[in-house]
């Protein structure tokens, strides 16, 4: 397990939660392709040195799928990752109609266990356009390799990862393990981000509450089954076609 985690997590100065979704085993015996799809905290924090690290590892991102709200995107420069033109920025807000409420976002980020899972399920109800846009892009091989991300890489990114991995036939145990790999930013990184965003540095004191707790994802997955029946039913309700779902599987699975 340790070797897998080391291979999955990319050590970068700007982003603490940049990792590869490759290697997870699907129920049909296939595995998720390595170096094809990544999840992360906001790519705006990547440094020039980080880009060199990615290049040295043979990682070239064709696209970045930004799950943040319009307010978050407008608040700060999109980052050096997009400056060269090699990586295209695609804005796919997870909740386009309500995410500018910072207090509500903080409440969601800090909740754990059953409350955290229920919060996730409420947010999911607004995410149909996001999933439709993301799956349409992942079904197009020319839009890969890519990374999707929110602010911290935990909540919105965690929900997208759960739905995506379920689509690929990955077990709930592996999905929960992937969620739990998400680490809270270091205090130094948090303080730097708060300063760059013009936010209250005292928010950095909540580092412990920003960690990803497995029980939150457990409750989310159980509630997802209760509300939606299956991942296919959920995706179809987002107006994602069966052929699109199958192309996503073909692009992201091997073996």
Predicted segments with their positions:
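Cys-dependent protein tyrosine phosphatase-like superfamily
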Residues: 1-147, 159-255
């Amino acid at each position: 397990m340790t070797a897998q985690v080391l291979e999955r997590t990319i050590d970068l100065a700007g982003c603490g939660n940049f990792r590869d979704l490759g290697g997870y085993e699907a129920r049909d015996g296939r595995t998720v392709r390595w170096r094809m799809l990544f999840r992360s905290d906001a790519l705006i924090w990547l440094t020039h040195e980080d880009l060199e690290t990615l290049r040295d590892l043979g990682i070239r991102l064709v696209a970045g799928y930004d799950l943040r709200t319009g307010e978050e995107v407008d608040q700060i420069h999109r980052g050096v990752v997009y400056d060269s033109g090699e990586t295209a920025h695609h804005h796919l807000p997870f909740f386009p109609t309500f995410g500018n409420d910072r207090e509500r976002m903080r409440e969601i980020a800090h909740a754990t266990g059953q409350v955290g899972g229920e919060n996730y399920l409420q947010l999911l109800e607004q995410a149909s356009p996001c999933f439709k846009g993301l799956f349409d892009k992942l079904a197009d091989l020319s839009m890969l390799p890519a990374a999707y991300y929110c602010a911290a890489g935990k909540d919105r990114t965690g929900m997208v990862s759960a739905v995506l991995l379920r689509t690929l036939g990955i077990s709930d145990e592996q999905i929960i393990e992937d969620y739990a790999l998400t680490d809270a930013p270091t205090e130094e990184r948090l303080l730097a981000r708060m300063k760059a965003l013009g936010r209250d540095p005292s928010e950095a004191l909540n580092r412990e509450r920003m960690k990803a707790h497995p029980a939150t994802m457990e409750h989310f997955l159980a509630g997802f089954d209760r509300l939606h029946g299956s991942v296919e039913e959920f995706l179809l309700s987002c107006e994602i076609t069966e052929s699109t779902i199958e192309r996503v599987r073909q692009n992201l699975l091997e073996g």
